Amino acid sequence: MGMRMMFTVFLLVVLATTVVSIPSDRASDGRNAEVNERAPWLVPSTITTCCGYDPGSMCPPCMCNNTCKPKPKKSGRRNH
């Protein structure tokens, strides 16, 4: 197969993919069906932290009252 023929086949594949994807996007109204059908109890409504109501997490106590010391920066190009 020559280069011209391969390019023509490539264009046909791109065109066919575009034509197939346009109607499916209209049918879904531009939204992701998976997100719309997600069970509400699986979506977290509050942010849980290690100092909140999750006692099983491994969290240092200094994170609860913001007294943790910052880690020293490593030497390197990005830290100038």
Swiss-Prot record:
The modification 4-hydroxyproline is found at residues 40, 55, 60-61, 70, 72. The modification Serine amide is found at residue 75. Residues 1-21 form the signal peptide. Expressed by the venom duct. It comes from the Eukaryota. Keywords: Amidation, Disulfide bond, Glycoprotein, Hydroxylation, Ion channel impairing toxin, Neurotoxin, Pyrrolidone carboxylic acid, Secreted, Signal, Toxin, Voltage-gated sodium channel impairing toxin. Residues 22-38, 76-80 form a propeptide. Contains 3 disulfide bonds. Its main location: secreted. Pfam families: Toxin_8. Glycans are attached at residue 45. GO terms for cellular component: extracellular region. It is found in: Secreted. GO terms for molecular function: acetylcholine receptor inhibitor activity; sodium channel regulator activity; toxin activity. Neurotoxin with probable activity on sodium channel. Induces intense repetitive firing of the frog neuromuscular junction, leading to a tetanic contracture in muscle fiber (spastic paralysis). In vivo, shows the same effect as the whole venom when injected on fish prey. The cysteine framework is IV (CC-C-C-C-C). Belongs to the conotoxin A superfamily. This is Conotoxin SmIVB. It comes from Conus stercusmuscarum (Fly-specked cone).
